[in-house]
């Protein structure tokens, strides 16, 4: 794990900037704030924090990077929302969200999905009543199966980032680093073949977002996206599970959303052996309030252990960002060069 602990001096140094930005922008989704984030990060974040993030980005010392020690005032934060739709109405965590955004901007460009949480850039991960046994980040009584974030999509992010605001029962985030796997004893060549069917995960389905954005143009684009999601579910795209350097490969897999019934015997055996190796090397990481985790989405899979939600305002509450190092790579999927939402 690549880890940095913020000091009291670090918190004091960034507090005036965060307060100023929180007073200047209405919410974390403000396009000008998001557009300015890389410049604001370069000017306002402590140099040693920027160097730490740059080291994680370029050297790949680990698939998991954790920044701890960000001050979180629980009284100011207020109760955990009942639903992600309620989370940004008069947000009392805007200063923390801005810090999280700036750290993410030091690694790449943040982006969102039209088919996920109403196209928001910053997501909320919290238990939702009725989702307890649903394969979704808002479940609680069952594990969230380990996966590569958005493994089905060619524009998936380089990093998925999580900022912990609350975690009273210390629910564990599961992470497996590709660097820990015993590649010489796996059938790497078979896993590099583009024969593995991967389907969209449940978070991109239309029932998990609002019926309308209020913008007819965006609604048309989003309807097209949902049709594409439907087509990928009915006719899954075949992709390789591994790519990059065959000696130390990158991964893209989500076993829960992969249809295996027509794979060759070799492909199935290679995939099952990889999954068994991942299970054996999986680590549990408990995020505490003020912890920010950056998971390398090329080099790790992640999930979450089950827990019993309370629905009393004290439940586990994380913020989430998707980050890419190649925003141009998704240009065909976005309405404009500076639009951060993939349709």
From Swiss-Prot:
Query: Which cofactors does this gene product need?
Result: Fe(2+)
- One of its Pfam families is TauD
Annotated stretches, region: Disordered: 199-218
**EC nos:** 1.14.11.-, 1.14.11.41
Q: For binding 2-oxoglutarate, which residues are annotated in this chain's numbering?
A: 316
Indicate which residues the UniProt annotation says bind Fe cation.
147, 149, 302
SUPFAM superfamilies, from UniProt? Clavaminate synthase-like
Cite the entry's keywords alphabetically: Dioxygenase, Iron, Metal-binding, Oxidoreductase
- According to the record, the signal peptide region is none
| One of the record's GO molecular function terms | 2-oxoglutarate, L-arginine oxygenase (succinate-forming) activity
Catalytic activity, reaction form: L-ornithine + 2-oxoglutarate + O2 = (3S)-3-hydroxy-L-ornithine + succinate + CO2; L-arginine + 2-oxoglutarate + O2 = (2S,3S)-hydroxyarginine + succinate + CO2
Free-text biotechnology note from the record = Being totally regio- and stereoselective, this enzyme is of interest for biocatalytic purposes to produce chiral scaffolds that are of synthetic value in the preparation of more complex functionalized chiral molecules such as natural products and analogs.
Q: Which InterPro entries match?
A: Alpha-KG_dependent_hydroxylase (IPR053447), Arginine_beta-hydroxylase (IPR023966), Clavaminate_syn-like (IPR014503), TauD-like_sf (IPR042098), TauD/TfdA-like (IPR003819)
Cofactor details (free text): Binds 1 Fe(2+) ion per subunit.
Q: What class of enzyme is it?
A: oxidoreductase
Biased composition, class Polar residues, residue ranges: 199-215
Q: Which domain of life is it from?
A: Bacteria
- Keyword Ligase assigned to the entry: answer is no
Protein role:
Alpha-ketoglutarate-dependent dioxygenase that in vitro catalyzes the regio- and stereoselective hydroxylation of L-ornithine and L-arginine, leading to (3S)-3-hydroxy-L-ornithine and (3S)-3-hydroxy-L-arginine, respectively. Cannot use L-lysine, D-ornithine, or D-arginine as substrate.
Q: Give the record's family classification.
A: Belongs to the clavaminate synthase family.
Protein name per Swiss-Prot or TrEMBL: L-ornithine/L-arginine 3-hydroxylase
Source lineage = Bacteria, Bacillati, Actinomycetota, Actinomycetes, Catenulisporales
